[in-house]
Structure formats: C-alpha cells, structure tokens
C-alpha cells in the first residue's frame, strides 16, 4: 500500500501483528532485564516470616511469566513471517549473497560515520538494521533455550522436559548449571547493548534523515521525502 502527498510518499510497512509484537517485546525485555539482574544479584537476606518477605519469590515469578510471554510472542512473530507482507520476512532472511546488500551495508556504515551526505531510501530495514535484527532473533532463541533449561531443573511439567537435555549437555562437557546461568546473563548484557544501539539508530534516523522511524512502529506507515539516494546510486 502506498500513499503520496506533495513531495512525501508513504508505504505501509509494519502490519498490526508486527507492531504488537514489537511493543510487547519491549515490555517483556524491560521486565526480564530488571528481574533477571536481581535474580543474579539478589536483594539482601532478611529474617522473618516468608509470607511477608517473599520478595525474591515474586521477582522470580514475574521473570518466569515474562519469559513465557516473550516466547509466545516470538513464536507468533515467526508465524507472521509466513503469512504477512514482504517486510515481515526480511528480518529472517538476510540476503548476504547479494552484492547490492553488501553495497547497502557499506553505504550505511558511511552514513553512520557522517561520511555520506544523504541517507538511503530503504522502505523496510536498512541492511545494517536487518543484520542486527537477525542477530537479535538468534540471541532471543538462545535466551529462551538457556532460560527454560534453568527453569527445567526445578519444574515438574513435561513441556519443559526437553530443555533438561541442555543441562545434561553442560554436565557432559564438564560444566554445570551455573555455566548456563553465566551464558544466560551474558546474553542479557548483549541484548542490553543491542537495545542501546537500536534506540540510538531509530532516534538518529528520525532526526537526521527524511524517514519516519518511531512513528512507523505506531501506525505502520513509513514516509519518505523525495530526493534521497536510491539503491542503484550506492554502487
């Protein structure tokens, strides 16, 4: 879907399920990172009746619940990649075999380093954002696997039983569940670094380019002003 007004053209990029996934993921990640930090570095122990001092228990419950919601919305996002528009699939298929894609990567690097005068005219994600989001999805899967592996150690539900093989794999390699915890926590910091870069790039594009970025994830439309560099000019 495309709309034109004066010298501005708008494309319907992000469908409602994609936008809902994005904002639910933002909420889940905020909850998971805060509660996960305190699980790794618990609050000081206090004596007394656990009924009134069950703070860490509530923190763990919130963390586990947010993790399950995070998993469900990610599965829904993967499903929508099959039934949604072309932009819903671009984050899962990075065309590294295309010369034009690498030309786009190089041009975006120059743009972010203030060496290019004009931004590119990407309707969906630019090549660097596409690669970064693909890496984020891989990290999300890693966090889900390691998180449920840790949860499976004290869960009696059969649905989590397959994740015990992850724990057994770490024991087989000479490690233990603490190693899983360390990798899971490292993943948290890596995702935190990704979030910082993601927010910076979104704000930067909204301010410095003629594209709408933040509002696109609200209403689904990306607007461009004419006169920007095209993909052909990158070469």
From Swiss-Prot:
Residues 1-19, 85-130, 204-235 are cytoplasmic. The chain crosses the membrane at residues 20-40, 64-84, 131-151, 186-203. Residues 41-63, 152-185 are periplasmic. GO terms for cellular component: [Ni-Fe] hydrogenase complex; periplasmic side of plasma membrane; plasma membrane. One of its GO terms (molecular function) is electron transfer activity. It is a multi-pass membrane protein. SUPFAM superfamilies: Transmembrane di-heme cytochromes. Probable b-type cytochrome. Belongs to the HupC/HyaC/HydC family. This is Probable Ni/Fe-hydrogenase 1 B-type cytochrome subunit. It comes from Escherichia coli (strain K12). The lineage of its organism: Bacteria, Pseudomonadati, Pseudomonadota, Gammaproteobacteria, Enterobacterales. The gene is hyaC.
